[in-house]
Swiss-Prot record:
Reactions catalysed according to its record: 2-C-methyl-D-erythritol 4-phosphate + CTP + H(+) = 4-CDP-2-C-methyl-D-erythritol + diphosphate
Organism the protein comes from: Azobacteroides pseudotrichonymphae genomovar. CFP2
NCBIfam families referenced in this protein's UniProt entry, alphabetically: ispD, PRK00155.2-3
The protein, known as: 2-C-methyl-D-erythritol 4-phosphate cytidylyltransferase
HAMAP family documented for this protein: IspD
Amino acid sequence: MKQKYVIIVAGGNGLRMKATIPKQFLLLKGKPILMHTIEAFYRYDTDIHIILVLSEKQKTYWTSLCQQYNFKIDHHTIEGGITRFYSVKNGLFSVKKNCLVAVHDGVRPLVREKLIDNAFKMAQKALAVYPAIPITDSLREITNRNNRTVNRSEFYLVQTPQVFLSDILINAYEATSSDNFTDDISVVESGKICTPTMIKGSKSNIKITTPIDLSIAEALID
């Protein structure tokens, strides 16, 4: 398999969590969420290149946390941008061509090795891969014009890690000047470089953005 990288995006402020510190630094089973996330990729492959994207003001705090919790997993910390788009773009400057690169949310600490492995293996052939899960709740479209039920079988919840041949993702980010993207598959699709492939995600691969999410993660974590 090609050389592997993961860009872990963790520069958010976590306003929905209503906590005094950003959500990626909140404790989960006695240590910061972000450490669990990094450990998940290190367990998958101890040789993976881990690139951590933080805001400038968070880098010093992260360094102090690593010292406090004796966190020794090797990773490269870089400064994020004003939006997620520019944070990932900054991370890509540290990624070589002709490699495989994953982009993962820093607050998805419960990602399993099986999902990571499946995404990387599929990306070798499909070039751009994303995990997703079907919607099980009823779904409605509510706008100024419509208030109607829609067919939930046509919609999926998209997760990370999203994995790419590095050339594909680098070229997609270089080809667009818009930063109105919520994930990296959307950036690749906008450039019409390739057609992304969906793989089966996991319900336990939750994104921790609210206090309820944190409680669920506490119950699910090994």
